[in-house]
Regions:
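Short active-site loop/helix that positions an aromatic residue
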Residues: 36-49
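Active-site and NAD+-binding cores of ADP-ribose-processing enzymes
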Residues: 25, 47-101
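Short, flexible beta-strand-to-coil junctions
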Residues: 7-14, 34, 55-60
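Generic low-complexity segments that are intrinsically disordered, proline-rich and/or Lys/Arg-biased
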Residues: 8-11, 37, 88, 100
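ADP-ribose/NAD+-binding catalytic cleft of ART/PARP-like enzymes
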Residues: 1-28, 44
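Catalytic cores of nucleic-acid ligases and guanylyltransferases
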Residues: 2, 33-34
Length: 101
């Protein structure tokens, strides 16, 4: 059964994601969260101001909880999807911008 999850990345990746989807990282998964604001936390910590959050709909049985991120620090659970996410599985795009201090 398909379920919604969220993936965040620097906003500059929008065009590539629209064209090619979301590719797995070097560890073999696409990281996902259950809420968009949770996904943002993983990118904002790297200093990005403009962040793209992709809402995706993927098969739940292909998603597993990952334990390589601190749930206490990020205040959320993280999940890994074991395939690339094709553009048709992306249901919406959200832009987040944080003020530069």
């Amino acid at each position: 059964m398909a379920r919604k999850y969220y993936h965040a990345t620097p906003f500059e990746n929008l065009e590539s994601i629209i064209d090619q989807g979301i590719h797995r990282g070097c560890d073999g998964v696409v990281y996902l969260t259950e809420k968009p604001e949770e996904a943002v936390r993983f990118v904002v910590i790297r200093g990005y101001v403009d962040i793209l959050v992709c809402e995706v709909q993927v098969e739940e049985d292909m998603v597993e909880e990952t334990f390589d991120h601190s749930e206490a620090f990020f205040k959320c659970r993280a999940y890994g999807y074991s395939e690339d996410i094709i553009p048709d599985e992306i249901t919406s795009y959200i832009k987040y911008s944080r003020p530069v201090s």
